[in-house]
Structures are given as C-alpha cells and as structure tokens.
Amino acid sequence: MKEQKLIHEGLITESLPNGMFRVRLDNEDLILGYVSGRIRRSFIRILPGDRVKIEVSSYDSTKGRIIYRLRNKDSND
C-alpha cells in the first residue's frame, strides 16, 4: 500500500545549498524542502519569497518535497 502524503502550502524563507529550501508553512511550521525532479527538469526557478505547494510525509514532518511553485498575484507575467 502506498504511503499517504499531506500537501501543504508555504512560503520559501531561505535558500540552502543543493536545491534545499527552508519553508514556512501556512500553519507556521518551519520545515526543510527539496525540489522535486519534475521541477528540476523543467528548470523552474524557486527563490526566497515564492509560495509553493509542498508534499510532506506522515512519517517525517520535518522534511518535504516541493511539487509546485504558485504564481504571484501581483506580478505582471
């Protein structure tokens, strides 16, 4: 049986080496996030201040995988 993962939204607060980021979730938890392979292959830039969707394992709630970068509402893309 496949493990159930929780999906949260959060804000990137700090960029760390090797594609790791410090993410503050909407429930004020601070976790370590790494970039998923699909985002890495698509060359999507993630910077501090970006809002992201992050997938957190139910076994280890201190680490998660960044699966989506949300668009900013105030940008003129």
From Swiss-Prot:
It comes from the Eukaryota. This is Translation initiation factor IF-1, chloroplastic. GO terms for molecular function: ribosome binding; rRNA binding; translation initiation factor activity. One of its GO terms (cellular component) is chloroplast. Gene3D superfamilies: Nucleic acid-binding proteins. Keywords: Chloroplast, Initiation factor, Plastid, Protein biosynthesis, RNA-binding, rRNA-binding. It is found in: Plastid, Chloroplast. Residues 1-71 form the S1-like domain. The keyword Signal does not apply. Its main location: plastid. One of the essential components for the initiation of protein synthesis. Stabilizes the binding of IF-2 and IF-3 on the 30S subunit to which N-formylmethionyl-tRNA(fMet) subsequently binds. Helps modulate mRNA selection, yielding the 30S pre-initiation complex (PIC). Upon addition of the 50S ribosomal subunit IF-1, IF-2 and IF-3 are released leaving the mature 70S translation initiation complex. It comes from Drimys granadensis. Component of the 30S ribosomal translation pre-initiation complex which assembles on the 30S ribosome in the order IF-2 and IF-3, IF-1 and N-formylmethionyl-tRNA(fMet); mRNA recruitment can occur at any time during PIC assembly. Belongs to the IF-1 family. The gene is infA.
